[in-house]
Amino acid sequence: MDGTVFLGGRVFDFAVRFIKNLRESGRRVLFFTNNASHNPEYYYDKLRRMGFDPQDGEILTSGDVTVEFLKSHRPGKPVYLVGTPELERQFTESGITLSDSADIVVTSFDTTLTYKKLDTACRLVRNGAEYLSTHPDFNCPTEDGFIPDSGAIAAFVTASAGVTPTYFGKPYRTAVTMMCEITGFPTDDICIFGDRLYTDIALGKKNGVTAILVLTGETTENDVSAAAEADRPDFVINSLADADRAIFG
């Protein structure tokens, strides 16, 4: 969402119009963000205030995907979580026990990050804990520039503990599976708009989903030119305004 339909606290008016036109044409809309620092309720409220009028079941985060994996594949196992209080609350409300001595470590985008949190995560992973991460994004775009994201935090743990995490969210198959389950459509009938080559666009390229890059967020035209052919989007547009004009005139 961030960098595609809004940037920080600034809404893209053309995005509001585009989403409205999609719904009125009978198309299914799903807002998917890798930013797990906030829970889905936060995004519902934010999008409502911005004028998007999100409906039930239209918002999915990498935190949702991670929680679903833990509940389905690691039931009852405690987790050490490096995340915001909102993400901690989402985990506990989903029935996941948080512990400082767990056999599973999950790192995420944590704006309350401390050295103690990093040290604990590294020690646990170094001693054999399973290492998971909600999403691989290195930077989060804001109105004031980029700030370190989940991937940067995971890189710290990997450098210290020597273990690469299993990632969820975009661009991984677990995310696509949840998208298909929620929308009821197969990958052939889904199109993703996003601003990042290595998450949004990679989701499409790796999983048979049409991928359209918008230049309102992290990626520049130079980045696209420098990317390998297999990693380039199916289409590049300046913003969702271009998509709105192309589809609806």
Provide a role label for each language-model segment:
Residues 1, 6-17, 21-24, 40-60, ...:
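Asp-based, Mg2+/Mn2+-dependent phosphohydrolase catalytic module
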Residues 28:
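Conserved phosphate-binding loops in N-terminal lobes of ATP-dependent enzymes
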Residues 35:
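Conserved phosphate/oxyanion-binding catalytic-loop motifs
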